[in-house]
Structures are given as C-alpha cells and as structure tokens.
C-alpha cells in the first residue's frame, strides 16, 4: 500500500510579483509550500520572473495582463508540473482581465481565484463583481458535479461575516462587505464547499489582509478576504488550515498574508 503524504497548498496575493520578489522568494524558502496560487501579479506574461521561481525548485504556469499589468494569476508547484486545465473562468464577463487559472497537480484540481474588488459600490465595477461571482458559482457547481478532488483558493475580495473584520462598522460602505457580495459567497459555500479556515477556526477572528495605513497590522485591524474552499472529495482529506502572518511584518511586503491548507494524499 502506497504511503500517504501531506501537501501544503497556499494562496497569496503578492500585490506585484516583481516589486515583492524578495519577499516571495524568502517566504517560499522559509515556509516551503508544495503548491502556491499567486494573485495580483501586476506583470505581463513576459515579465513573470520564472527564473527566480525555478531556481527554488518550482514549476509554474501563469497569466499576466497587458498593457497596464494589473491583475494576473499564477500556480507554482514543486510536486510535479501543473497540467493547465483553464486560463480563464468560463463565463467571465470580461475575459481581458486575468483573474483565474486552473491546473491538475497531484490528482487535485486547483483553481486560483482573484475576484474583482468591486469598488466603488454601487456602480459598474460592483456589477462586474457580482457577474463574475455568478460565473464562479456556475463553474464551481460543474466541479462539484464532476466529483473530482478540487480546491478554489485565492483572493475572493469578500468579507463573509462580522467575525471576519476588525471593525465591521468601518467597512459598511465597501464593496468587500456589501450584502450582495456576502450573499454570493454564502451561496457558493452552500453548494457543498468547505471553508477551510472556518472548519478549523469556527469562532476565531482570523485575518488575511491589513491595510498599509494607521499601523493596521500592528493593531491587528484586519479583514479576511482570502479563502480556500474544498470540494467534498478533498475536504475529507483536510488536515489543517491557517494564515502565515510572518511575511506581512516584513519590509516592502504585500498587504495580504498567505493562507494555507494541508491535505493528505
């Protein structure tokens, strides 16, 4: 009988991969994740620092976004080449924006999510956010119907509940905390997905993002907008989940911290 092993899968909004490359490579060396979904690359396809990634033993697939180099998503793996299955979310109302990439790695289908911010709310950007989440719902249901072990990990740009924010009253007018956005997230989870952080930390205030201003990180004035949702076939193999706050305290770092799950395969 083949021995089982644990895989650590992380999601990290790097907020500019080239400007934070030292942060990323240091974190990869120290935390040693097996698979990583990166969001907000802010680079073109040609500008992705593949040499630095490969030097640390990772293979990668990515999709940048020209010409202004916003958005961008990538999947890194040191446990086998990612077999790309999608470079965009089916039904995305704006396919020019790089917000989703998907691959099979070690028998797991990994969808890397970078949902629209949606601000200002109300307005066309918020309308796009809701339409994008509708497309995610449809694809997520297809994944569940397929019965494959799957994870949708990344920056959802949704604060699900009051427990996921330091001071809810300060976010009442923000698209990340809008009732319609929260409802979309609840409906997604209700399809049958497991929110990994809440599975292990049901009553704790766990944050993944702290604004740069007003010493938010030092005061732990954060929000939880980065999530990992696991299909039933993978959730039964879930062994742990958390947030690595360490790199958020480094110099010239992202305003997000990486969140992670461990699964046994």
What is each PLM-predicted segment?
Residues 1-55, 62-73:
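N-terminal, active-site-proximal structural segment of metallo-dependent hydrolase catalytic domains
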Residues 9-13, 28-46, 110, 139-162, ...:
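Active-site beta-strand/loop signature of hydrolases that rely on acidic residues for catalysis
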Residues 16-20, 95, 128-136, 177-180, ...:
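Soluble or luminal CAZymes and related metallo-dependent hydrolases
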Residues 41-44, 50-120:
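Structured beta-strand-rich core segments of catalytic domains in phosphoester-bond hydrolases
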Residues 87, 130-144:
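Internal catalytic-core helix/loop-beta-alpha segment
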């Amino acid at each position: 009988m083949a021995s089982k092993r644990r895989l650590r899968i992380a999601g990290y909004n790097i907020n500019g991969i080239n400007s934070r490359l030292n942060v990323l490579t240091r974190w990869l060396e120290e935390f040693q994740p097996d698979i990583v979904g990166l969001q907000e690359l802010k680079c073109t396809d040609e500008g992705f620092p593949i040499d630095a990634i490969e030097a640390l033993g990772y293979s990668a697939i990515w999709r940048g976004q020209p010409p202004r180099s916003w958005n961008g998503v990538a999947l890194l793996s040191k446990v086998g080449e990612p077999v790309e299955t999608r470079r965009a979310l089916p039904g995305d109302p704006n396919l020019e924006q790089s917000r989703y990439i998907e691959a099979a790695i070690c028998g797991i289908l990994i969808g890397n999510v970078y949902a629209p911010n949606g601000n200002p709310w109300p307005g066309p950007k918020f309308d796009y956010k809701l339409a994008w989440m509708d497309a995610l719902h449809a694809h997520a249901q297809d994944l569940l119907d397929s019965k494959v072990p799957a994870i949708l990990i990344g920056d959802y740009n949704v604060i699900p509940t009051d427990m996921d924010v330091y001071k809810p009253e300060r976010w009442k007018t923000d698209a990340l905390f809008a009732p319609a956005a929260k409802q979309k997230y609840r409906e997604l989870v209700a399809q049958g997905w497991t929110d990994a952080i809440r599975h292990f930390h049901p009553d704790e205030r766990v944050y993944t993002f702290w604004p740069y201003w007003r010493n938010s990180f030092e005061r732990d004035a954060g929000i939880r907008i980065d999530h990992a949702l696991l299909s039933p076939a993978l959730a039964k193999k879930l062994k742990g989940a958390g947030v690595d706050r360490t790199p958020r305290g480094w110099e010239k770092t992202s305003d997000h911290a990486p969140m992670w799950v461990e699964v046994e395969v």
